[in-house]
């Protein structure tokens, strides 16, 4: 039971750190993180399209992030490494954040979603699914998904092959949840796939934002 509580606590802490970094590093094209325990402390790998922004002038920003991770989140001797995302269009976290930013700038959700869908597919993705949840068109919250191509939906392939990302857009009507799933180029497709040749949009029956 103690072990279960430990893993739950660590998972919650990683989620909170991820949310913090997403807000702090949006302009860097933040694409997620990986936290690993080492004999010397805690190794934190930050994935970003623009590593220079994460590091900051003279390393100022990365030193500040290190201090916050240690003092605010309780990481033991955090050592931050920054890994460049070679193609941000194939990183679901980056695309979710960018789509959320587009919504916050006032771009209509359908226009923003289809633009993201085309850009991702044009960069070689085998498939993509975008799900927007919240008050998109009026008082009632609903969920709409946009999808195209080949996407593993269940089992181990869905966990290991598909890049997944989540972000939130803060609008006057409320919070819009943005989920993106991308099947990268070259992924070996299993039997459990959904085949959609053309872009499709559908409303998902739901009374609450995801």
UniProtKB/Swiss-Prot annotation:
It comes from the Archaea. SMART domains: KH. GO terms for cellular component: cytosolic small ribosomal subunit. Residues 17-86 form the KH type-2 domain. One of its GO terms (molecular function) is structural constituent of ribosome. It holds the Pfam family Ribosomal_S3_C. Keywords: Ribonucleoprotein, Ribosomal protein, RNA-binding, rRNA-binding. GO terms for biological process: translation. The keyword NAD does not apply. Binds the lower part of the 30S subunit head. NCBIfam families: PRK04191.1, uS3_euk_arch. Part of the 30S ribosomal subunit. Belongs to the universal ribosomal protein uS3 family. This is Small ribosomal subunit protein uS3. The lineage of its organism: Archaea, Methanobacteriati, Methanobacteriota, Thermococci, Thermococcales. The gene is rps3.
């Amino acid at each position: 039971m103690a072990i279960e509580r430990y893993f739950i606590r660590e998972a919650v802490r990683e989620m909170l750190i991820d949310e913090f970094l997403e807000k702090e590093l949006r302009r860097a094209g933040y694409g997620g993180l990986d936290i690993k325990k080492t004999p010397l402390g805690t190794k934190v790998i930050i994935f970003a399209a623009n590593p220079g922004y994460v590091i900051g002038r003279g390393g100022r920003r990365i030193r500040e992030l290190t201090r916050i991770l240690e003092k605010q989140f309780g990481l033991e001797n955090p050592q931050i490494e920054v890994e460049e995302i070679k193609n941000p269009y194939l990183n679901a976290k980056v695309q979710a954040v960018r789509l959320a930013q587009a919504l916050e700038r006032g771009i209509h959700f359908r226009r923003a979603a289809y633009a993201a869908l085309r850009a991702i597919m044009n960069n070689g993705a085998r498939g993509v699914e975008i799900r927007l949840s919240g008050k998109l068109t009026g008082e009632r919250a609903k969920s709409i998904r946009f999808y195209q191509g080949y996407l593993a939906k269940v089992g181990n392939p869905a966990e290991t092959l598909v890049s997944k990302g989540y972000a939130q857009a803060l609008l006057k009507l409320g919070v819009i949840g943005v989920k993106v799933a991308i099947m990268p180029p070259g992924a070996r497709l299993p039997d459990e796939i959904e085949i959609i040749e053309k872009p499709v949009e559908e409303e998902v029956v739901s009374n609450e934002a995801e």
